Amino acid sequence: MAKTSNNTKTVENTIPDEVSIETVETKPLSMEEKIMLKNLANWMVGFNKIESNGEVNINAGGSIRVPRAEVISQYENGNKLLRGDGDGTHATIYIDDKATRDYLDITSELIDKNKVKKIFAINGLDDFRNEIYKTFTTQAEKVLLIKIIRECGFNDFNKIRECEVLCGMTV
């Protein structure tokens, strides 16, 4: 800002004396580190390994730890169990490691009891219907929805009926 007095002009310094720069150190991902994979399906799933010999099998609703390099290789080679519809949404196997999900640009959320409770909290049957049709598209997700409804004991007939119509199963 400029001030004038007695025909002289003084200028105040508006530049800060110290500029603080935050540096965030990012460590490279360790490809040998084992990360958690969760099977969202109500049946056993598996795939052949790319990085080494053998296969990975995950029991229904179970989880297993697999080297990050194997998971990234499977994802980049188009494993539908991990990729779902192509970008990680609607996948049968959930990658439960934030660093790996960020590396692969996966933004989908885990479908669990909390997510279903949030969906059941939606007011209005039309909005609820739109959300369940958008969220639960694969057979594994539909079976999971019915299972969670049974476990949580929801008591909204119209919403439960809508889920039954979508899934083709009864609660």
Where are the predicted features?
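Arg/Lys-rich low-complexity patches in intrinsically disordered regions that function as generic
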Residues: 1-7
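Compact, well-ordered interaction domains used in eukaryotic information-processing assemblies
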Residues: 20-109
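N-terminal intrinsically disordered, low-complexity tails
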Residues: 7-26
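Charge/polar-rich, low-complexity and marginally structured segments
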Residues: 110-171
